[in-house]
Amino acid sequence: MKETDVLKKLEIDEYYYGDFGKKYLSNSDISTLLTNPLALGQPQKPIPAFLVGGYFHTAILEPEKLNKFKIVESTTRNTKAYKEISGGELCLLQHEVDKIELMTEKVLNNNVCRDLIRGINIEYERPGITELEGLNWKGKADIINHDEKLIIDLKTTADLNKFKWSASKYNYDLSLIHISEPTRPY
């Protein structure tokens, strides 16, 4: 398959995150390779922080897809109501959604952020592929601002003072390598 055809296919979430996309390593595989290589390729258990981050990503980049998230009006994930409504699925809590909506509003009401994110010559969720050290990698640039020649990778954190440790824990530095290489527009 030609690279252009692969990239076109990877633009579709079902392919990017499904069997087709699993032919390529991605940032989620980096931690597994570093901490438990035998678990490579096994599904990862979803965690609330990643669900919250995913909702923020979607709110900024693809707000038309927010309805795919299941939201439960509950104070915690331990309540009887949450367990009944969620059916064992990891769901967002309403107060988490409220917080993310406020964050999204703050980001988009900031002139600098809004212009970088919603400018004229912008691409969202642009996939790329590359070979590094004989391995095939995929990456997806959240935002490419061609006018400013920027690749923007959105991140969330529960505690800004601990962000540098989160960046290390989740290998954000390494994710930037495989995001920027395959999607480098310049």
Report residues per predicted region.
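Short, local alpha-helical segments
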Residues: L40-Q42, K162-A167
